[in-house]
Amino acid sequence: MILLKIIHIIFVMIFLSIFFPKSLYASTSLIRKDHIIQKNLENFDDQSAYALGVSLGNYINHSFREQKRLGVILDKNSLLSGIRDSLSGKTILSDQEISMELIKLEKKLKYFEDIVLKKEAHNNKIQGDLYIKKMLKKKDARHTSSGLVFFIKKKGSGKFLHDSDVITVHYKGSLINGNEFDNSYKRGQPLSFSLDSVIPGWIEGLKYIKKGGLIKLVIPPKLAYGETGVPGIPGNSTLIFEIELIDIQSK
């Protein structure tokens, strides 16, 4: 949660104030005066403090960009003032007021996050359906009643798969916009697992090839990660996998 990230940053900055008090107050002084003072980083402590400060600043900027994406814009100067006042022990809000404001902010972020995610998921579903229709027009396209679209690049040989089989595969997965979210080839190592432990689109699609086979799957969200998605894969995403079936081991 974005709010928790900000709270984490505040705690880290308090930690820095204990070990690098001069560096921290020098930074807040620059903020108050709104001008730049060049400083030579002559020793390890100065360089470490500066590096941590830049890292924390980048972290805060990232959090603020994510909030802006949700339509929530917080004032950076007010955030920094709150940190400075906390370090000095002179805050303009009581502990109870601070707790109430944080709860309100968390609810606000959650509300707008839900709206944005639902909107993105709705758009992903529309774009995914259009992409599948486009793929179905290709002459070598095949599809199933469940909505899976596949292209057999190489059939392979031997026996077909069963749900309980342990398979070894190389694969790469991407979204319909071309963004790649996984690639075993780049890791330089194939993956082994039981077929019944993966998404339905894989279970259904891989049964059309044998050992040594190669297949391309276009998987609608209901056969992948559904409306909610997973980290790196937004809700209602249609997925594209190119899978090489290297080995099959029956249990």
Curated annotation (Swiss-Prot):
Q: Which gene underlies this protein?
A: fkpA
**What task does this protein carry out?**
PPIases accelerate the folding of proteins. It catalyzes the cis-trans isomerization of proline imidic peptide bonds in oligopeptides.
GO terms, molecular function: peptidyl-prolyl cis-trans isomerase activity
InterPro entries named among the record's database cross-references: PPIase_dom_sf, PPIase_FKBP_dom, PPIase_FKBP_N, PPIase_FKBP_N_sf
Q: What is this protein called?
A: FKBP-type peptidyl-prolyl cis-trans isomerase FkpA
The record's section on SUPFAM superfamilies has: FKBP-like
Q: Reaction catalysed?
A: [protein]-peptidylproline (omega=180) = [protein]-peptidylproline (omega=0)
Extract one GO BP annotation from the record: protein folding
Can you tell which superkingdom this protein's organism belongs to?
A: Bacteria
Recorded source organism is: Buchnera aphidicola subsp. Baizongia pistaciae (strain Bp)
For the protein in the UniProt heading, the enzyme class is isomerase
Question: Under which EC number(s) is this enzyme classified?
Answer: 5.2.1.8
Does the keyword Isomerase belong to this entry? yes
Similarity-based family: Belongs to the FKBP-type PPIase family.
- The UniProt record lists the PPIase FKBP-type domain at 164-251
Supply the alphabetized keyword list: Isomerase, Rotamase
